[in-house]
């Protein structure tokens, strides 16, 4: 009955947007609803209930729906079945016939199935003009069940002010709809009125209720074209659809061009070559990183020596004055090349090692380029020339080893010097030091002796500081 009446009312159903992020949910719900209405496969009993001086057609009780969900979906807990029923009702597929709040109750409350024409899978985005026609039509029918609720009366007054210039047209549309409805059978009209009311309860919900039609911004970003083409519930032509005072009108969907397809192919080819890690590998890397740096996080591991501003222990200042790196500091240099570069003492130790091997020009060039980026603009050109003459010019006293491609780019950049003139050369030298010089430094006796000396001297330093504090 509901399906047939919905088809008669339809002005023209547009094809559902299969790209909608909610379409998977809608399909699952509609599969449940279809089975629920199928009498041949044991659906929910739909019946006409006799009331005082009237009949209530095509209704089911909340208890029947909950029991059907528990039986056919293997749900053991009634609370879970009620929750699932409420989620289905919130989307407008099932609705209470006497309440604007779309929820499920496990009692004798009467519910009715929504017509397929009004299903959310049709991607409705109704205009406020349609809502104004609906509310205006309700006021023309002197029936208790069609009286406006308080929030609906407020909405009607607001819409009347917003559409003051075209209210006459809206009123005429509402009158035309009322005339059409009066020609229908009384029972059919009663069902259609409730289904129409439920449709607007979904798209213009009661204040305090969740609007299930609002799109999640994260889902919208995954859409190829998140904009929808708005369509009128009552078949109002495009020229009469004015800009909504609430919603921003959508633009027509642009046709896909050859350039769009080429860009998509290029993007997909890049995705094929992209190295993707499994979540298990990512988790392992994150755990390993956390375990490696846990002793350097003062929120997790108490700092040694302690912060003198908190504990009144000046051991940290004594160590800093001695300019000898602590064991933790030396150990951290071995974590990565960046760790030793961002530590002043680490850079000094690394530079001494490179000087002993007569290969310090790479690090000095890298540090000079870093310093160039911090220079005042008026000194940049002069500093660029100095770096070029020292490291890259023919016959430079500290010539560095660059590949031909990087050297050619740098030569062009020097003609119009700036802070990032040596960016390519610096990156090449960085990779060279990371793969060669840094690895040799970690294996060198200089680093190993420094690390072992700190381990051996830790207890002696503690005893010496303790003795100084006792004597004072």
Swiss-Prot record:
Main location: cytoplasm
CDD domains, sorted: DEP_RGS7-like (cd04450), GGL (cd00068), RGS_RGS6 (cd08737)
Keywords assigned by UniProt, alphabetized: Cell membrane, Cytoplasm, Membrane, Nucleus, Signal transduction inhibitor
Domain RGS: 336-451
GO cellular component: cytosol; membrane; nucleus; plasma membrane
InterPro entries: DEP_dom (IPR000591), G-protein_gamma-like_dom (IPR015898), GGL_sf (IPR036284), RGS (IPR016137), RGS6/7/9/11 (IPR047016), RGS6/7/9/11_DHEX_sf (IPR047017), RGS6_RGS (IPR037956), RGS_DHEX (IPR040759)
Pfam family, one: DEP
One Gene Ontology molecular-function label: GTPase activator activity
Membrane protein topology class: Peripheral membrane protein
Domain DEP: 40-115
Entry-linked SMART domains: DEP (SM00049), G_gamma (SM01224), GGL (SM00224), RGS (SM00315)
Entry keyword Ion transport: no
Keyword Lipid metabolism among record annotations: no
Residue span, G protein gamma domain: 261-330
Location within or outside the cell: Cytoplasm; Cytoplasm, Cytosol; Membrane; Nucleus
Subunit-level organization: Interacts with GNB5. Interacts with RGS7BP, leading to regulate the subcellular location of the heterodimer formed with GNB5. Interacts with GNAI1.
General function of this protein: Regulates G protein-coupled receptor signaling cascades. Inhibits signal transduction by increasing the GTPase activity of G protein alpha subunits, thereby driving them into their inactive GDP-bound form. The RGS6/GNB5 dimer enhances GNAO1 GTPase activity.
Record note on domains: The RGS domain interacts avidly with Galpha and mediates the acceleration of Galpha-mediated GTP hydrolysis.
Name of the molecule in the record: Regulator of G-protein signaling 6
Native source organism of the sequence: Mus musculus
Chain's gene name: Rgs6
